[in-house]
């Protein structure tokens, strides 16, 4: 487990292949409860290449000096990401 926010990643390997490749991350909040949004790609075994960009929001809780995952929300497509952005922009304008 990670001891600092900088160590948190969603990269993971299976059989020597980086199945989930983190492209970027933005820390949305820090503290005992931290929220991070990640941009990543998943390995497509059939095509033997990485798929389109995906996004996930993860919540971590720091307990006993280590960050532990507490929740996640996966954004399934660029279209869904745009709809989330539009909804938030609409609410923030009010």
What are these model-predicted stretches?
Residues 1-82, 86-94:
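Positively charged, low-complexity terminal tracts
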